[in-house]
């Protein structure tokens, strides 16, 4: 298991960019949920997650991402930027890539 590290690397009036490193699984999903809740509570309407160093994503993490997206409604977006092939595959298989913005 690899720990999850979340770091806010850039911020604008509209939203934030977050570096995501490690694994999002049942053990770390609450850490992601708390982090995203803090950003949403602060009024972020656009959250870009830099997923280049995200090594693993399971259904717990997917649930957190979808819940955060639902909380934003039509007023905002969550973008998963540059997920690794194994993470992209999970997003595609589960259909989450149609609910969240996934770039390249």
Regions found by a protein language model. Give the residues of each.
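Amphipathic alpha-helical interaction surfaces in cytosolic regulatory modules
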Residues: 23-99
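Short acidic-hydrophobic, aromatic-tinged amphipathic segments that line or gate anion-handling sites
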Residues: 101-104
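Short beta-strand/loop segment at the start of cytosolic alpha/beta domains
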Residues: 1-19
């Amino acid at each position: 298991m690899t720990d999850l590290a979340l770091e806010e690397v850039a911020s604008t009036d509209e939203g934030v960019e977050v570096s995501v490193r490690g694994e999002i699984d049942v053990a770390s999903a609450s850490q992601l949920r708390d982090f995203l809740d803090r950003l949403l509570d602060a009024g972020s309407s656009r959250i870009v997650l830099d997923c280049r160093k995200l090594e693993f994503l399971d259904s717990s993490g997917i649930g957190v991402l979808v819940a955060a997206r639902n909380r934003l409604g039509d007023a905002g977006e969550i973008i998963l930027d540059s997920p690794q092939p194994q993470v992209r595959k999970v997003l595609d298989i589960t259909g989450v890539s149609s609910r969240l913005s996934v770039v390249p």
